[in-house]
Amino acid sequence: MSDNITDLEPTAERPNVRKVFVKTYGCQMNVYDSQRMADSLAAEGYVATDTPDDADLVLLNTCHIREKASEKLYSALGRLRKMKDAREANGKELTIGVAGCVAQAEGQEILRRAPNVDLVIGPQTYHRLPNALARVRSGEKVVETEYALEDKFEHLPSPKREETRKRGVSAFLTVQEGCDKFCTFCVVPYTRGSEVSRSVKQIVAEAERLADSGVRELTLLGQNVNAWHGAGDDGREWGLGELLFRLARIPGIARLRYTTSHPRDMDDSLIAAHRDLRQLMPYLHLPVQSGSDRILKAMNRRHKADEYVRLIERIREVRPDLALSGDFIVGFPGETDQDFEDTMRLVRDVNYAQAYSFKYSPRPGTPGADLDDHVEEAVKDERLQRLQALLSEQQYAFQDSMIGREMDVLLEKPGRVAGQMVGRSPWLLPVIIDDSNDRVGDIIHVKITSTGTNSLIAQKLA
């Protein structure tokens, strides 16, 4: 557990300061949440460190989507228990906190299974983190998972400009949380709550602050991001499409993305944004989970497979260069060979640039956990292997199709060798450019010459 994967840069050494190590598991929103928790702690005098070995506070921001994520948490807590015992033997302290969706789902159970934990705090209450830590210092074991009545975003401090600059030229911005879809396999409605949209005023203010700190690309986040809605500047009710047009007017913001979407919430205004908004990148993550109508109904997805395919056709009609990403679950209870073949057919019909696929694992508290007719693990394994082979074939074909193409690339960081830069293509793929004297944050025109492992190799054009 030596990696800090939250994009929190360690701060220069200062004597007698409290240090925090944040470990993030799971989705992009957890990365965003970790950054905001770090901002709260910075306001209390904590500085980030890139190792738990010298941290005064270790905070694990957790994911509950799959069973393995919970197992990772308890394995990490076992290692931290030994570290905490060693500290106490030398008269020193280590505070251990668990945040995120496992914290929300399990609460007091975490303290029972891991008594070395001092603090459990959910994703809707992390604005109370400084107060919770004060209670821990007074000797209390704290579980803070009740859904807050107040808007947490109104109570979170903004990071200092130099801290935002250290995080890079691409940034996440949460605009929506929670989900009301209640897919039978999913824990999100139970760990993140009902759908809540942040106000246009809040979102624009945060986006302007990020742009002022040098951010060029914004990715809007939500568990069901295209369900976002709110009162617009013009007095009308806006959807995500209108919000994207508003954010595109902010000076300095050159690129926009959003994730994760639900097919039922892809409305006309959002499709129009893909057609008309040059800042909106031609990349869409739109999960379908299965190509079988019978399984989609059992999952409570509220759409059919052919409706999903027709939706993709509509978007590609207005944005022919769109690259599509998706999510798939194999082995959902009752999935037959024919159901799986329907999924394979949908994948062939849609042709994905990238996709994520998993074996179904029942999550406690979800309707899917109570279903009978579970698929044997060996069958799940075989289906997953076949699906991933097809998706990999499509992914490599998409990357190969980039060879010879010209495109604009946003430079994000120096490469591993002198003179090399790493950027991001409009289709989200990393692009490696040799012999570049450009700066991070520049957008340069390149020609793709070859492909690497999940990356593109390019030559800068004059």
Curated annotation (Swiss-Prot):
Reaction catalysed by this enzyme: N(6)-dimethylallyladenosine(37) in tRNA + (sulfur carrier)-SH + AH2 + 2 S-adenosyl-L-methionine = 2-methylsulfanyl-N(6)-dimethylallyladenosine(37) in tRNA + (sulfur carrier)-H + 5'-deoxyadenosine + L-methionine + A + S-adenosyl-L-homocysteine + 2 H(+)
Arranged from A to Z, the UniProt key words for this protein are:
4Fe-4S, Cytoplasm, Iron, Iron-sulfur, Metal-binding, S-adenosyl-L-methionine, Transferase, tRNA processing
Q: Which GO terms describe its cellular component?
A: cytosol
Q: Disulfide pairs? A: none
| Alphabetized GO MF terms | 4 iron, 4 sulfur cluster binding; metal ion binding; N6-isopentenyladenosine methylthiotransferase activity
Q: Where's the MTTase N-terminal domain?
A: 18-138
The protein's name in its UniProt record: tRNA-2-methylthio-N(6)-dimethylallyladenosine synthase
Organism, per UniProt?
Answer: Brucella anthropi (strain ATCC 49188 / DSM 6882 / CCUG 24695 / JCM 21032 / LMG 3331 / NBRC 15819 / NCTC 12168 / Alc 37)
Q: What is the lineage of its organism?
A: Bacteria, Pseudomonadati, Pseudomonadota, Alphaproteobacteria, Hyphomicrobiales
